[in-house]
């Protein structure tokens, strides 16, 4: 009986400790990923002021996520032409490819963003097929 009681006491001490360690780990990972995820979300949801502030602070506008997508890829995919145009004019890499092998110009064509596609072309943008020639 004493042995069983000691085991219960040990578990009562152990579980809060594990929970505390897991909470610290989660908070640390959350803080590490917060800035990158937030900026990609800003491109997806059309938060142009956040994007402009990010770029004006000199941060990497060609940062790629786990899918190889950049702010320009996401703004094109989401139809936020104002952000896309701002990024192109700010000299984002217009020929960077995502993990699907698609360039920003491929996305502009696919999303039928004619004006943005023209601008990307003016800044030297090419399609995947053109890059592979």
Positions of the model-derived regions?
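Ankyrin-repeat-protein effector appendages
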Residues: 2-3, 10-41, 114-133
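Ankyrin repeat A-helix N-terminal signature
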Residues: 41-47, 74-80, 107-113
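Ankyrin repeat structural motif
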Residues: 47-55, 80-89, 113-122
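Extracytoplasmic/periplasmic/luminal assembly and interaction segments
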Residues: 63-69, 73-83, 89
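Ankyrin repeat boundary/linker residues
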Residues: 65, 98, 131-132
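A generic tandem-repeat structural signature
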Residues: 93, 98-113
């Amino acid at each position: 009986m004493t042995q069983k009681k000691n085991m219960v006491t040990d578990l009562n001490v152990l579980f809060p400790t594990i929970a505390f360690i897991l909470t610290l780990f989660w908070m640390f990972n959350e803080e590490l990923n917060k800035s990158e995820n937030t900026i990609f979300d800003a491109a997806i949801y059309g938060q142009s002021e956040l994007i402009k502030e990010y770029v004006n602070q000199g941060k990497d506008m060609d940062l790629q996520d786990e899918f190889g997508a950049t702010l320009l890829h996401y703004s094109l995919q989401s139809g936020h032409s104002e952000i896309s145009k701002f990024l192109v004019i700010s000299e984002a890499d217009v020929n960077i490819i995502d993990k699907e092998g698609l360039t920003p110009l491929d996305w502009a064509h696919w999303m039928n963003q004619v004006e943005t596609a023209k601008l990307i072309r003016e800044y030297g943008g090419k399609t995947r097929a053109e890059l592979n020639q």
